[in-house]
Amino acid sequence: MKRTFQPSNLVRKRRHGFRSRMATPTGRAILRKRRAKGRNKLSA
């Protein structure tokens, strides 16, 4: 059986990266929440 996690930096960036977060209103809300919480890393 194939494992579910097949790492790929390109897909990681495209799906969870900063620019993809900024592209949608909900993504910006996520970044706002993470800034408010004081996260060192905002996105992948």
Swiss-Prot record:
InterPro entries: Ribosomal_bL34 (IPR000271), Ribosomal_bL34_CS (IPR020939). GO terms for molecular function: structural constituent of ribosome. Keywords: Ribonucleoprotein, Ribosomal protein. Residues 30-44 have a biased composition (Basic residues). It comes from the Bacteria. GO terms for cellular component: ribonucleoprotein complex; ribosome. Residues 15-44 are annotated as: Disordered. GO terms for biological process: translation. Pfam families: Ribosomal_L34. Belongs to the bacterial ribosomal protein bL34 family. This is Large ribosomal subunit protein bL34. It comes from Rickettsia rickettsii (strain Sheila Smith).
